[in-house]
């Protein structure tokens, strides 16, 4: 879908791309090679730029230490830090996380909670690493590695994503 819309359709219809607030490609890699092959596309460089792609993949320290194979992490991947909106390895503590969406096992309802979801980009891998108190995907180690949080790419940073969508929409409206 990313290829179909961003790379092909927007290339042929720049008038639609110009009206795009942002494309959140969550949990799937966007690479430097993708951007070089499609110069009409821009990756986000901050928290309120518009007409950009926002992408990340979240892993735990074990995947980094083991250099684990992960089906959604491609060579030359780029991620943006959801807590400080930087592309480098500047650490963002969990105190910058506005809240994770988790299941309360007692009520069987989802709720916003602090689970210690910090974030730091690992530039050479193109992922976010977190020390969150969160269960990694299980039963798919051969596909995602032993500590993939592919299942938490949204939920770990849920309120930061909501806040960011509002900021980007406001920036877009202001620019019109």
What do these predicted regions represent?
Residues 1-4:
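Glycine-rich nucleophile elbow surrounding the catalytic serine of serine-hydrolase chemistry
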Residues 7-157, 162, 166, 171, ...:
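Surface cap/lid and interfacial helix-loop subdomains adjacent to catalytic sites
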